[in-house]
Amino acid sequence: MHKHNNGLKTAALFGVLWAVLLGLGAIIAAGTRSTTPIWIMALIGVATTAYGYWNSDKIAIRSMAAYPVTEAQAPQLYQIVRELSVRANKPMPRIYLSPTMTPNAFATGRNPKNAAVCCTEGILHLLDARELRGVLGHELMHVYNRDILTSSVVAAVAGVITSVGQMLLIFGSGDRRNANPLATIAMALLAPFAASLIQMAISRTREFDADEDGAELTGDPLALASALRKIESGVSQLPLPPDQRLVNASHLMIANPFRGGGIRRMFSTHPPMKERISRLERMAGRPLL
C-alpha cells in the first residue's frame, strides 16, 4: 500500500507540473489573444520530456566527467553490482567512475537495459565494502524502479517552466497587447516556484523509496545508514562547486553534493539526511551506533 500510494502521489504531482506548464501557455495566450502559445508550451513539454528520456544517462555522466571502468580496474565495484543484480534478477548496468573526490554516487539511464551506475573516487576512499554495498543497492533500486526516467523528465519540464517564467518576467509584463500584466507577473514568479516545489516533492518520495527498497535488496539497512552519515560529513568538507551542469544532475545523486543550509536546504531535492537515517534505523529495529 505504501509503494502504491507513493506511485499515485508521483503521478499526481507530475500532472500538476504539466498543468503549471500549460498555465504559463494560457497566460501568454490571454495576452496575445491566441491559443498558439498553449500548443507551443505543450510541444516544448513533449520535446523536453523526450530529450530527458533519451539523454538522461549522457547528461549526468558528462557533467561528472565520468568514464567507464572495466572489471580489472574496479573489481570490488563489479563484484558488488553483479551480486546485487543477480539477487534482483535484473540486467547488470554499466559501471562508471568519476574522478571527483566529493563522496557521492548516482544511477542513470532510461530503463534497466540502458542503465549506468557511477561512483566518485571520493566515495570509494570513504566507505568500507559493506557501506558501499548499501549505496549501490540504493542506486540499483532507482534503476529498477525507473526513478531515473521520472526524475530526469521532471527536472527537464521544471527547467522549461523556469526559463519561460523568466522570459515572461522580462518581456511579458511590458507588452502593450497584454490585457492583464499583473497576472503575467504573478504567474512568471509563482510558476518556477511551484515547479521547484513539485520537483522537490517527487524527488524526495523517490529517495525514501530507494532507501527502503535498497535496504531490502541488501538485507542491511544499517549499512546504508552508516554510508549516508559518512557521505553527509564528506560533502560538508568537500562539496561540489555550484556549476550549472552539476546542479542539473544533482537530483540523481544519493546525497545533495553542495554545501548549504537554510533556504537552500529547505528546497533540496533530497530529504533531510537525519530523517533518512532514522527510517533505516526503524527498518533495522535498532539505532546506528
UniProtKB/Swiss-Prot annotation:
Its cofactor is Zn(2+). The chain crosses the membrane at residues 11-31, 34-54, 152-172, 182-202. GO terms for biological process: proteolysis. It is an enzyme of class 3 (hydrolase). It is found in: Cell membrane. The keyword Zinc applies. PROSITE patterns: ZINC_PROTEASE (PS00142). GO terms for molecular function: metalloendopeptidase activity; zinc ion binding. The keyword DNA repair does not apply. Its EC number is 3.4.24.-. Its main location: membrane. It is a multi-pass membrane protein. The active site is at E139. Pfam families: Peptidase_M48. Keywords: Cell membrane, Hydrolase, Membrane, Metal-binding, Metalloprotease, Protease, Transmembrane, Transmembrane helix, Zinc. Binds 1 zinc ion per subunit. GO terms for cellular component: plasma membrane. Zn(2+) binds at H138, H142, E207. PANTHER family: PROTEASE HTPX. Belongs to the peptidase M48B family. This is Protease HtpX homolog. It comes from Paenarthrobacter aurescens (strain TC1). The gene is htpX.
